[in-house]
């Protein structure tokens, strides 16, 4: 092989705006999936309740998400993030049409990071409660309740999975916006 052959290369036929447009389409797709994950988590947790049947109608044990302020915060946080993601779809579509927009990408990075903090905070706090529901804490006499409230625990655990998946998707959105901005600054 000759040394000159290595220097000869073919230029990419993909334009830089085409790559940015592809990244913007991926951004839109990820936002839609994140909406589904966070909204599904809010709905699943918000409709979680279970009543244990007993011999008498006067004594009933009931578990509802609203009994725990942490779960209420989880539902509100996921609902806020879902609403934000729906509103941000407009900017995501704008970026498909105008791939060189910088100010709106910076705004999206800022708001995506704020929503990531809110979503992760709600999911992490609820994860601690779900862990206690599954495992308990013998030192403080908090016994596991998931043997009795099986459906309640399955729904809350599933809600956490959707919420943490939404967190990962928002991290990807932040990376995509940062990459698109860095590609634009390198071109100027």
UniProtKB/Swiss-Prot annotation:
- Among its keywords, does the record have Zinc-finger? no
Q: Where in the cell is it found?
A: Cell membrane
Q: How does it sit in the membrane?
A: Multi-pass membrane protein
Give the glycosylated residues: 49
Spell out which residues lie on the membrane's Extracellular side. 46-72, 127-159
The residues that cross the membrane are 25-45, 73-93, 106-126, 160-180
Q: Which UniProt keywords apply?
A: Cell membrane, Cell wall biogenesis/degradation, Glycoprotein, Membrane, Transmembrane, Transmembrane helix
Name the Pfam families on file: CASP_dom
Describe the family membership recorded for this protein in Swiss-Prot or TrEMBL: Belongs to the Casparian strip membrane proteins (CASP) family.
Q: Is Metal-binding found in the keyword set?
A: no
Using the UniProt record, give the first listed, main subcellular location: membrane
- The source's domain of life comes to Eukaryota
Q: Which GO terms describe its cellular component?
A: plasma membrane
Function as written in the Swiss-Prot or TrEMBL entry: Regulates membrane-cell wall junctions and localized cell wall deposition. Required for establishment of the Casparian strip membrane domain (CSD) and the subsequent formation of Casparian strips, a cell wall modification of the root endodermis that determines an apoplastic barrier between the intraorganismal apoplasm and the extraorganismal apoplasm and prevents lateral diffusion.
Q: What is this protein called?
A: Casparian strip membrane protein 1
Cytoplasmic topological domain ranges are 1-24, 94-105, 181-188
What biological-process terms (Gene Ontology) are attached?
cell wall modification; cell-cell junction assembly
Assembly: Homodimer and heterodimers.
- Cite the InterPro entries for this sequence: CASP/CASPL, CASP_dom, CASPL
């Amino acid at each position: 092989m000759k040394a000159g052959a290595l220097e000869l290369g073919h230029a990419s036929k993909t334009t830089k705006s085409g790559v940015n447009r592809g990244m913007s389409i991926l951004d839109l797709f990820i936002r839609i999936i994140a909406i589904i994950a966070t909204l599904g988590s809010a709905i699943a947790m918000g409709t979680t309740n279970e009543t244990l049947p007993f011999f008498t109608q006067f004594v009933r044990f009931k578990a509802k998400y609203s009994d725990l302020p942490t779960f209420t915060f989880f539902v509100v946080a996921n609902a806020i993030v879902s609403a934000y993601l729906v509103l941000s779809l407009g900017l995501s579509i704008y970026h498909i049409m105008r791939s060189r927009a910088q100010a709106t990408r910076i705004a999206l990075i800022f708001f995506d990071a704020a929503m990531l903090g809110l979503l992760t905070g709600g999911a992490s706090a609820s994860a601690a409660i779900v862990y206690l529901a599954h495992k308990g804490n013998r030192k403080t006499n908090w016994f596991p309740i998931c043997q009795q409230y099986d459906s309640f625990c399955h729904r809350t655990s599933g809600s956490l999975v959707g919420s943490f998946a939404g967190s990962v998707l928002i991290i990807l959105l932040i990376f995509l916006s940062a990459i698109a901005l860095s590609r634009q600054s390198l071109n100027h």
